[in-house]
Design a protein with these regions (language model features):
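Membrane-interfacial alpha-helical segments at the cytosolic side of multi-pass membrane proteins
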Residues: 78-93, 141-156
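Alpha-helical transmembrane segments of integral membrane proteins
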Residues: 5-12, 102-106, 110, 133, ...
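Small-polar-interrupted transmembrane alpha-helices in polytopic inner-membrane proteins
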Residues: 15-20, 103-123
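Membrane-proximal cytoplasmic C-terminal regulatory module of class A 7TM GPCRs
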Residues: 37-42, 155-165
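Membrane-interfacial, low-structure loops and terminal tails that flank and connect transmembrane helices
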Residues: 93-99, 160-165
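Helix-boundary and loop/linker segments of multi-pass membrane transporters
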Residues: 56-60, 95-101
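"…centered on the first transmembrane helix and the immediately adjacent amphipathic helix/loop
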Residues: 1-83
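Interfacial helix-loop-helix junctions of multi-pass membrane proteins
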Residues: 115-139
Length: 165
């Protein structure tokens, strides 16, 4: 079972990295359009009577919230990536598996390094460019993802009958 989980976490990590790469390959215009659609969806779900607003009022709200949606997406992508990398190490026979500091540090650093290379990649995409702020947000998300997996494992190990051998 542990081997299957390990393979699943590795595949999830690879899938997330590929997904992030493809999102970064979108031109500035394509990326902005996707962000606007996602923002519209969130606003229609969470803002009462959003659908009753005029198109102009809707676009104004979308413009106001789109920045935050983009930054939350950055945070979430890298939280998920770091979480899955942590899972890959946790379900393996890694020599530092029982060292919580290293188990947090290594996935966080791997995801942060990927965030840096992702920003370099955006230099070569029309209408996009690198952003130190995005790397910082990505890194914070990656740290959160690693901490989240660590906390979950601590909680699960305290559940009777779930202690590892």
């Amino acid at each position: 079972m542990k081997r299957i989980l390990n393979i699943l976490f590795i595949l999830l990590s690879m899938t997330l990295a590929i997904m992030i790469f493809f999102f970064s390959s979108d031109t500035g215009e394509e990326s902005g359009s996707k962000s606007s659609r996602v923002t519209r969806l969130f606003l229609s779900l969470f803002v009462e009577d959003f659908k009753n607003l005029s198109e102009e009022e809707q676009e104004l709200l979308i413009g106001e919230y789109s920045f935050f949606v983009r930054k939350i997406a950055h945070f979430s992508e890298y939280a998920a990536l770091s979480f899955s990398i942590y899972g890959s190490f946790y379900t393996s026979n890694s020599p530092f598996r029982n060292n919580r500091r290293k188990m947090i540090l290594i996935p966080w650093l791997m995801a942060t390094l990927y965030a840096m290379t992702d920003e370099i990649h955006q230099i070569f995409v029309a209408g996009r460019g690198p952003s130190v702020v995005d790397v910082m947000i990505d890194s914070l998300g990656a740290f959160f993802g690693a901490i989240a997996f660590c906390v979950i494992t601590i909680i699960l190990l305290k559940v009777p009958g779930k202690r590892e051998k």
